[in-house]
C-alpha cells in the first residue's frame, strides 16, 4: 500500500484544526450574543491550549449540551476535511491517489499481472451487501442528524465557492443560524423509540441517500475503468442492501409478525417510489426527437410489445403524451407498467423492468447518443439492479433458545406426551427432526391455541409465506439463528417453517423456501462451527435448497465479550478458514456475514485493512457486513462520504477476491505455529478477570452501565432475556459502558500478558514477530486496532471511575489488575509497532482536541453517578444521561 504523502497529511491537519477553531469560535460568538458569555468562556477554556481549564463544582446541563455540540462540530469538520483531502488526492497533477478506491485498486491489480478479462470476470462474481441494523445505544436523534447535514453542506459550499464581501457576511449569518438551530434542539430522547420509527430511520437512507450514491458510484467506476484500461467498462459489481430493522426479534419482543409484514410493505413501497422517480427524471431528459435522431428498430419493437401488454387505451395515452419522441414514449409505457406492478399487465419482476432499461441504453448507443446512454441511462440501470422492487432484503433473526421454546409449544398443542424440547439432547432432537422433516403434515391448525413463542413463530412464517407467494423472494433475507450451538438449532427452523407453509415438495423430497443461516458467536461455537456447517449442508432438506449458496454469520461482539479481543479475532480467523473448506467440500458458494460493530471491541477497523487480514481463500466474491446505528450516520449521512465508504467496500472486496483466487487456500503465515499458545494465554488472562469474585460488582459500579440501562437510545432492551447477568448482557452496552469510563477494556485486555509471554519465554519467536508484524496482515490489523483502543483509554479517568466501587478493597484489587494489563499491552505494542502518537498522528490529534472537554464531562459524570446511586432522583438521571450522550459524542462512539 502506498502511503499518502506527508504534505497532504499536513494540509489536512492544518485545515481540520483551522476550520474547527473557526466554527467553534462562531458558536461561542452566537452564545455571547444570546447572553451566555460565561458558557462561551468555559468552552474556550476546554478547547484552547492557551486557556487554563475552569474548575466547576458542577456542570450545568447547558454546559454538557454545549460540549456535546462542539464535539459534533469537530466530527463534521473532520468529515469535510477528509473529503476535501481525498478530492485533492484524486487530482492527477498531485500523483497521489486514494488507497482502496477503484482507480488505485484497478491500477494495482493490472500492475500485478491480472488481465482485463480476469477483472471483468471478477466484477461478475463480486457481490457486497451492507446490512443496516438498529443500535441500542445510538445517541443521535434524526432531527439532530438533519442539522448536522445542514452544517456539513454549508462547509462544503464554503470550500467550493468564492464569496464577495457581501456573500461572505450572509454566509456567516447562515452558518450561525444553523448552529443556533442545533443548539436549541434537544438531544436526549424523551421516550424509547418505537420499532416503526427505527424502520423509518433506515428507510431514509435507502430512499433518499443511497439511490444518489449508487449513481455516483457507477460514474466513478466508469471513469476509473476507462482511465486504466481505455475500454468500455463492465457493469458495476453487484451491490445490495439488507436490513434487520423490523426483522430482528432476538430478545426484542416489540418486533411482532405484524411489524415484520408492515416493514416488508414499506420497503416495497419505497423501492417503487425510487423507481418512479428515476423514470420521471429520465423522461425529462430523454427528449430526443425522431426527426433529429435515427430510431433503432429494437426501440420500435419494444414500444409495440409494451403497447400490446398494456392494451390499446393505456398505450395510446402513453404514446400520445410525447408524439415523435420514441424514447420518452417507451419511458411512459414503462411507467404505466410500473404503476400496475401488482396486476397482470404490470411488471412481474424487477428483471423485466431492467430489460426495458437495457433497450433504452442500447438503442441510444445505436442511435449515436452514447454520452446520453452512459450518463443518464446506465446509472438508472445500476440503481434498478441495486434496489429492484424490494429496496433492501429484510433478514429475520431469532435466538436458538426461543425456537426451542416455540417447538415445545407446538408439541404441547399437538398432544405429544414428551414436549420439553429445550431439554432434549442433541441426538434426541436430531432423531425427531429427521423423522418429521419427511412429511408436510403440520403440527397445528390455524385456530389452535398456542403458547406465546409458538404463536409468534407460526404467525411470522405465515406472513413470510404470504410475501413469497405475492411478491416473490427478492425482499427476504435469510433466517438467522443467533447462538447456533448445534445443527439441530438450524434444522428446527425447517420444521417451524413447515407450520407456515414454507416447506415444499420437490422431486427429491422436501425443501425449504427460506434460506437458514447460522450465527456463531461464542468462542466454543466458533470452534465447533465447521462441524455444524458440514452436518447442515449434508442434510437432505439443505441439499434441496433452491440456491446452492449458504450464508454464515460471524459474531464479533459476543466472541470478544466471551474470550477477549485476541482470542476472538483468532477464533474468527480460524473459523473462516475451516468453514471455507467445508463449503468447498460441498461445492457450495459461501457468503460470510461479518457482524462487525462500530468499536474495536465489536470488530471495527478500516475496511481495506480488514479485507487484507481475511484468511486466504475465504473471500470468493460475496460478502455481507452489518452497519449499525451510529456507524450508519457516520458513514452514510452525507453522499460524498457514503460514496467513498461504499466504493472502498466494493473495490476492496473485488481486489481481495482476485488476490485470494491466485494464492493457495489455507495458506498460512509461518508465525501461526506459535499463535495457539499466545491465544490460550490471552483467553485465560481475560477469563480470569471476568470470572474473578466481585468482577460483576466492579463492572456495574465502575462504569455507568446502570445509567445506560435507563437511556431511551434504542427500542431494544439491553439484556436478551432480562436475567441481568453478565452472560445475558448484550455486547453493545457492555462495550459502551467500558468506553464511557475510559477503560476501553474490550479492545485490548489480554493482549499484553499474551505477547509479553512471547517476549520473555520465546525470544527468537518474539524477534521474528517484530520483524514480520507488518507483513502478516492478520496480526497487523489486530495490533493496530488494540493500539487505537489503548490510545482512547485514560488511566487517570479509569482510576476515577474505579473509585465509585463501594468495596475499596475490591476496587483496588481489580483496578490494579486491569491497570497492569493496560501498561503491559502498551509496552508490547509500542515495542512491536513503534510510538503510537508519532505513527497515528490523526488519531493522536483527535484525542488531543477532545481531551480537556472530555475530562470535564467525566468528572461531572462521576459526581452525578455518586449522587444518583445514593438518591435516584429523576432530574439527576436526566443530567447524568446528558453526560452519557456528550461523552459518547466526544469519543465518537456509543458501543
Regions found by a protein language model. Name each.
Residues 345-358, 362-368, 372-385, 390-398:
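Extended, charged alpha-helical coiled-coil/arm scaffolds that mediate oligomerization and mechanical coupling
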Amino acid at each position: 500500500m502506498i502511503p499518502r504523502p506527508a504534505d497532504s497529511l499536513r494540509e489536512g491537519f492544518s485545515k481540520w484544526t483551522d476550520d474547527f477553531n473557526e466554527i467553534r469560535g462562531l458558536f461561542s460568538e452566537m452564545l455571547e450574543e444570546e447572553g451566555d458569555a460565561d458558557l462561551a468562556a468555559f468552552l474556550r477554556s476546554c478547547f484552547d491550549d492557551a486557556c487554563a481549564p475552569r474548575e466547576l463544582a458542577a456542570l450545568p446541563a447547558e454546559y454538557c449540551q454545549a460540549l456535546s455540540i462542539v464535539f459534533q462540530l469537530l466530527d463534521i469538520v473532520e468529515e469535510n476535511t477528509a473529503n476535501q483531502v481525498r478530492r485533492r488526492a484524486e487530482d492527477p497533477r498531485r500523483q497521489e491517489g486514494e488507497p482502496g478506491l477503484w482507480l488505485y485498486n484497478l491500477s494495482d491489480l493490472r500492475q500485478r499481472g491480472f488481465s482485463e478479462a480476469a477483472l471483468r470476470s471478477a466484477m461478475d462474481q463480486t457481490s457486497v451487501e451492507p446490512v443496516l441494523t438498529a443500535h441500542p445505544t445510538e445517541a443521535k436523534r434524526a432531527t439532530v442528524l438533519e442539522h448536522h447535514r445542514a452544517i456539513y453542506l454549508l462547509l462544503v459550499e464554503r470550500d467550493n465557492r468564492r464569496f464577495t464581501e457581501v456573500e461572505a457576511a450572509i454566509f456567516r449569518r447562515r452558518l450561525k443560524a444553523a448552529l443556533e438551530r442545533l443548539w436549541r434542539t434537544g438531544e436526549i430522547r424523551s421516550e424509547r423509540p418505537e420499532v416503526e420509527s427505527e424502520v423509518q430511520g433506515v428507510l431514509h437512507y435507502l430512499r433518499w441517500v443511497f439511490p444518489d450514491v449508487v449513481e455516483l458510484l457507477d460514474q466513478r467506476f466508469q471513469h476509473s475503468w476507462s482511465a486504466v484500461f481505455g475500454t468500455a467498462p463492465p457493469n458495476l459489481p453487484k451491490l445490495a442492501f439488507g436490513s434487520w430493522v423490523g426483522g430482528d426479534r432476538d430478545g426484542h419482543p416489540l418486533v411482532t409478525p405484524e411489524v415484520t409484514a408492515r416493514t416488508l410493505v414499506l420497503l416495497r413501497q419505497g423501492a417503487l417510489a425510487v423507481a418512479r422517480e428515476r423514470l420521471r427524471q429520465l423522461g425529462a431528459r430523454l427528449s430526443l426527437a425522431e426527426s433529429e435522431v435515427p430510431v433503432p428498430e429494437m426501440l420500435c419493437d419494444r414500444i409495440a410489445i409494451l403497447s400490446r401488454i398494456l392494451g390499446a387505451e393505456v398505450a395510446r395515452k402513453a404514446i400520445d403524451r410525447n408524439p415523435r419522441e420514441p424514447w420518452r414514449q417507451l419511458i411512459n409505457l414503462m411507467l404505466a407498467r410500473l404503476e400496475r406492478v401488482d396486476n397482470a399487465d404490470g411488471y412481474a419482476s424487477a428483471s423485466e423492468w431492467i430489460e426495458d432499461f437495457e433497450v433504452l441504453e442500447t438503442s441510444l448507443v445505436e442511435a449515436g447518443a452514447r454520452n446520453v446512454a452512459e450518463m443518464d441511462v446506465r446509472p438508472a440501470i445500476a440503481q434498478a439492479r441495486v434496489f429492484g422492487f424490494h429496496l433492501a432484503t429484510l433478514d429475520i433473526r431469532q435466538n436458538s433458545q426461543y425456537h426451542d421454546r416455540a417447538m415445545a409449544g407446538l408439541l404441547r398443542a399437538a398432544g405429544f406426551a414428551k414436549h420439553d424440547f429445550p431439554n432434549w439432547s442433541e441426538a434426541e432432537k436430531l432423531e425427531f427432526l429427521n423423522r418429521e422433516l419427511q412429511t408436510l403434515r403440520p403440527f397445528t391448525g390455524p385456530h389452535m391455541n398456542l403458547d406465546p413463542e409458538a404463536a409468534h413463530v407460526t404467525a411470522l412464517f405465515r406472513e413470510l409465506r404470504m410475501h413469497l407467494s405475492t411478491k416473490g423472494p427478492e425482499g427476504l433475507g435469510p433466517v438467522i439463528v443467533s447462538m447456533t450451538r448445534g445443527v439441530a438449532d438450524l434444522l428446527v427452523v425447517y420444521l417451524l417453517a413447515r407450520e407456515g407453509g414454507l416447506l415444499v415438495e420437490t422431486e427429491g423430497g422436501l425443501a425449504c423456501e427460506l434460506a437458514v443461516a447460522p450465527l456463531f458467536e461464542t468462542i466454543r461455537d466458533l470452534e465447533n462451527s465447521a462441524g455444524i456447517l458440514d452436518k447442515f449442508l449434508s442434510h437432505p432438506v439443505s441439499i434441496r435448497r433452491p440456491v446452492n449458496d449458504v450464508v454464515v454469520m460471524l459474531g464479533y461482539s459476543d466472541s470478544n465479550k466471551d474470550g477477549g479481543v485476541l482470542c476472538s479475532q483468532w477464533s474468527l480467523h480460524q473459523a473462516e478458514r475451516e468453514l471455507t473448506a467445508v463449503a468447498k467440500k460441498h461445492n457450495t458458494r459461501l457468503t460470510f456475514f461479518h457482524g462487525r460493530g462500530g468499536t474495536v471491541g465489536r470488530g471495527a477497523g478500516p475496511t481495506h485493512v480488514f479485507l487484507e487480514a481475511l484468511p486466504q481463500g475465504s473471500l470468493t466474491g460475496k460478502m455481507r457486513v452489518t452497519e449499525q446505528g451510529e456507524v450508519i450516520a457516520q458513514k452514510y449521512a452525507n453522499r460524498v462520504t457514503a460514496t467513498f465508504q461504499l466504493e472502498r467496500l466494493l473495490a476492496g472486496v473485488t481486489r481481495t477476491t482476485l488476490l485470494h483466487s491466485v494464492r493457495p487456500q489455507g495458506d498460512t503465515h509461518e508465525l501461526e505455529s506459535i499463535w495457539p499458545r499466545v491465544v490460550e494465554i490471552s483467553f485465560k488472562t481475560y477469563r480470569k478477570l471476568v470470572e474473578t469474585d466481585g468482577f460483576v460488582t466492579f463492572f456495574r459500579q465502575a462504569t455507568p452501565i446502570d445509567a445506560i440501562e435507563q437511556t431511551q437510545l434504542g427500542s431494544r432492551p439491553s439484556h436478551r432475556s432480562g436475567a441481568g447477568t453478565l452472560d445475558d448482557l448484550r455486547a453493545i452496552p457492555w462495550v459502551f459502558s467500558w468506553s464511557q469510563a475510559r477503560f476501553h477494556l474490550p479492545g485490548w485486555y489480554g493482549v499484553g500478558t499474551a505477547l509479553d509471554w512471547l517476549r520473555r519465554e520465546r525470544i527468537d519467536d518474539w524477534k521474528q514477530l517484530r520483524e514480520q508484524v507488518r507483513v502478516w496482515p492478520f496480526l497487523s490489523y489486530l495490533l493496530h486496532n488494540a493500539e487505537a483502543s489503548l490510545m482512547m483509554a485514560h488511566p487517570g479517568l479509569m482510576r476515577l471511575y474505579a473509585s465509585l466501587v463501594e468495596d475499596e478493597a475490591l476496587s483496588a484489587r481489580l483496578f490494579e489488575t486491569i491497570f497492569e494489563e493496560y501498561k503491559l499491552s502498551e509496552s508490547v505494542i509500542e515495542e512491536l509497532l513503534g510510538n503510537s502518537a508519532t505513527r497515528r498522528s490523526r488519531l493522536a490529534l483527535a484525542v488531543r482536541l477532545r481531551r480537556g472537554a472530555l475530562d470535564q464531562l467525566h468528572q461531572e459524570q462521576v459526581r452525578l453517578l455518586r449522587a444518583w446511586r445514593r438518591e435516584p432522583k429523576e432530574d439527576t438521571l436526566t443530567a447524568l444521561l446528558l453526560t452519557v450522550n456528550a461523552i459518547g459524542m466526544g469519543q465518537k462512539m456509543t458501543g
